[in-house]
């Protein structure tokens, strides 16, 4: 629906711009198959802010992938794209963002991407009924976290081209992509559909710190969660929406330890959240993904149990995690 005060043309341009951001971000899944030197944007002209966003995303967001595949850091990339500043809709003043009459009830809240881990669980705990819970390719963990918050879980489906799996099985390059950027872009499109003007994330302070250095170059496994990435994403959103959409993390000032101490105050979420790598596999089915259980052996499980242990009795700890990995 066109928002009150928006022309149909403006709304169409906004939706087209948001879809463009999804395509630019999601392209990282396919770029990594061969990491080509030339990257061509063939979906028409893009704004300067989108160009800055996508260049940085495919550089810093793919450095972990490059390092683990023994590729140059930074990757050698030459861009073929056309910039058209006239694509941006007229900017509106924040606080005066109009919404569709039929979506006003949903617009009372902020759209929160829910992965099911401790960060999104805490965001829902903080926002309460002001949150609109949203997930992509729903599994047991986000369903459980949304239910613990007393919220309906809105969903979207993302399907990777099956050819990508074929290439992987034949030995194509594979590895980490900036998933948070893909999730944020899809969430922005979903926010517009639900009448929300904010996409609220749960990215913490340490996400802005490099996780390793390669040849003097910073590599950050969590770059897509960093403050720099957030600012670049907001710049691109401003360019395509005229200020109608905002994204930010309410956990940005806090450390992992502080987030753990905050989560223990919500008993419902303590029994619902799941921060386990085995629950988020793509091609490989796991019990953790299907049933929402902890494997207790992946780096994420080890880190999370270590963060939570000081705040829980041994009995409560074992109830939540189904074991005692710190003693095994």
Q: What are the functions of these language-model segments?
A:
Residues 1-109, 126-161, 195:
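RNA-binding accessory domains that recognize and position tRNA/RNA substrates
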Residues 29-42, 191-199, 308-319:
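Short helix-capping/linker segments at secondary-structure and domain boundaries
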Residues 85, 98, 300, 308-328:
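Long, compositionally biased intrinsically disordered regions
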Residues 120-123:
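Short glycine/serine/threonine-rich phosphate/pyrophosphate-binding segments
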Residues 137-275, 279-291:
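ATP-dependent adenylate-handling ligase core
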Residues 277-279, 291-306:
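Local cysteine-cluster metal-coordination motifs and their immediate loop/turn environment
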């Amino acid at each position: 629906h066109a928002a009150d005060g928006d022309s149909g043309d403006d709304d169409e341009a906004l939706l087209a711009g948001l879809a463009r951001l999804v395509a630019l971000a999601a392209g990282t899944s396919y770029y990594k198959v061969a990491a080509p030197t030339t990257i061509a944007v063939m979906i028409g002209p893009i704004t300067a802010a989108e160009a800055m966003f996508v260049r940085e995303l495919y550089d810093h967001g793919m450095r972990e992938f490059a390092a683990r595949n023994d590729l140059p850091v930074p990757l050698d990339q030459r861009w073929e794209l056309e910039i058209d500043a006239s694509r941006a809709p007229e900017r509106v003043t924040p606080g005066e963002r109009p919404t569709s009459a039929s979506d006003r009830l949903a617009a009372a809240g902020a759209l929160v991407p829910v992965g099911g881990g401790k960060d999104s669980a805490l965001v829902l705990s903080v926002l309460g009924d002001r949150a609109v819970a949203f997930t992509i390719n729903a599994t047991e963990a986000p369903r459980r976290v949304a239910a613990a918050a007393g919220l309906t879980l809105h969903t979207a489906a993302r399907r990777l081209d099956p050819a990508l799996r074929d290439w992987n099985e034949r030995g194509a390059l594979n590895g980490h992509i900036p998933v948070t950027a893909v999730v944020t872009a899809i969430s922005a499109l979903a926010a517009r559909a639900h009448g929300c003007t904010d996409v609220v994330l749960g990215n913490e302070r340490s996400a802005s710190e490099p996780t390793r250095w390669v040849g003097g170059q910073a590599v950050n496994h969590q770059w897509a969660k960093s403050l720099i990435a957030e600012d670049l994403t907001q710049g691109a959103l401003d360019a395509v929406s005229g200020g109608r959409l905002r994204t930010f993390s309410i956990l940005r000032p806090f450390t992992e330890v502080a987030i753990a101490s905050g989560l223990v105050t919500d008993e419902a979420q303590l029994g619902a959240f799941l921060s386990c790598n085995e629950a988020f596999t793509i091609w490989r089915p796991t019990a953790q993904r299907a049933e929402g259980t902890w494997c207790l052996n992946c780096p994420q499980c080890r880190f999370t149990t270590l963060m939570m242990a000081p705040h829980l009795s041994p009995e409560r700890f074992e109830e939540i995690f189904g074991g005692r990995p710190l003693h095994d």
